[in-house]
Amino acid sequence: FYRPLPPFVHHAVELFRFGTRGYEKNIIAVIVLGLLGTLLGMVTPQATAILVNDAIPDSDRILLWQIGLVLVATAIGKSAFGMAQAILSLRVENAADSSLQPAVWDRLLKLKPAFFRSYSSGDLLTRLMAVSQIRSQLSGATQRTLLSAVFSLLNLALMFVYSWQLALVGMGLTLIAVIVTVVSSTLLVRKERQQEAGDGEINGLTIELINGVSKLRVSAAEGRAFAAWAKKYSHHIKLKADIKRIDDSVSVFNEALPLVSSILLFWFAILFIEMAQSTGDSGLNMGTFIAFNSAFGTFISGVTDLSNTVTDVLGIVPLWERAKPIVQGTPESDPTKADPGRLTGKIVLDRVIFRYREDGPLILNDVSIHVEPGEFIAIVGPSGSGKSTVFRLLLGFETPASGTIYYDGQDLAGLDVQAVRRQLGVVLQNGRINSGSMFDNITCGALVTLEEAWEAARMAGLAADIEQMPMGMHTVISEGGTNLSGGQRQRLLIARAMVVKPKIILMDEATSALDNRTQAIVTESLDKLNATRVVISHRLSTIRNADRIYVIESGRLVEVGSFEELVCRGGLFARLVARQLE
């Protein structure tokens, strides 16, 4: 069982809270252990000051042993705290990963079908993996580095205790580091935003090219396809080089900062010590400076670590922007929607108007269709007239701009659309066949027996083909059914639609690749089911026996009647029939 994401996620911090829910005590323990480790680290500068100012000048062996034991105990304690912190961080990190990734996948699969029109498969994949990258960016190592860097800033207070003048010098160097970090991070976020968008485009194009490789071969367009990919890839490489250049510049700066800081620090320290000696002031002395230098070393190391970590963490910004459409998307399922109950097969489209975009053309304009239980209804018309859009509306993939869709007198907008779909047998024009066995593809997750799968195969005229396969119903087929013929693929999709014996069957060009004998078998099987059938087809033999034929042209319903009635009228349908008979 995996927890679903909350209905709306406002920002990346909410994702972190969701992933670490139940591990708040571990996070607090990580912070406390980091603080204790930092406090133990502050013992070293003070012990150094006592060693130089008291133990060595006075040849105090007992004090020397005491300081040594304190430093050993400090090192052991700091290591123990660090190990415990790492274990707890790993536990939190694994918990976040095991909660977030399934929850985001669950959200993606539950989004409305209209959402997927806006993104290619490759682009969606990069957006999906962006959540995993965010989690990785906020990994335990990053958290520990960030906490250690923040806590190391406590040494700044110790520096002011030893010498406020040198502490101000350290503050000035820190200010320079902050400016460099802000500027470089701004540039990186801008470049990484472009890179993430480019990665999505490249992945989308790559998947399209792989899926369409046979079409590229037929049209001899491999060169143009490679040129299109290479253009995007070269831009990606350029952005990657720019990002690497900025990262390297920041790394060089952070490597040079401690060295330059030490040089400046020693120069100012010599000045301040000479001034103290000339005036007889008891201010800065050698022991105090060595202690200050130890505290400053920890402080400047924390500053550089913080600079590097902040730069990495800000890389979350473009990743979050990529992931937002998924994690902030509205799930299709709505617990407030009503259960449709057992559908009898009555369907009504009442004055439906639909367009895919608000500023786009009307796809359907005032279309009304009435289907009684058990009727066989056909929808025909020229290509692009809006026939397949009717199916998308019936399946709840799209929402009409105006008008209503009824199942058994119930408005689809108020029904649990997933419960409606479970009672439909659907064969879409672009139906997909998954990699797996014939049985898996026919059942498609439905709770049916092997015998019921065989019955569906017989009804679709596919049983004889399956019996000739090496492993029968358990024969593995490739993704997309590339090792099946076009007719076998269509019959497999038809068997999938009929396996649960639905009361409503929607078929979009489902028999275009079948011969007359096989189509007769399928038609006879559908008649025996006594189900409501709504069929889109250009094939005359498929729709000849329809109870009613609806003719759509340019999104408008222009004719309704039986096959013979429409042919006798001499309208659009008659012209479509004449065109096929020529």
Please describe what each predicted stretch is:
Residues 27-81, 88, 160-165, 263, ...:
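Transmembrane helix-loop-helix hairpins at lipid-water interfaces of multipass membrane proteins
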Residues 44-50, 142-185, 241-290:
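A hydrophobic transmembrane-helix motif
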Residues 102, 106-123, 194-242, 315, ...:
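Loop segments that connect adjacent transmembrane helices in multi-pass transporters
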Residues 198, 202, 214-221, 245, ...:
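Cytosolic ends of transmembrane helices, especially the final helix of ABC transmembrane type-1 domains
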Residues 327-378, 411, 455, 524, ...:
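Primarily ABC-family ATPase nucleotide-binding module
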Residues 395:
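Helix-to-loop junction immediately C-terminal to a conserved catalytic motif
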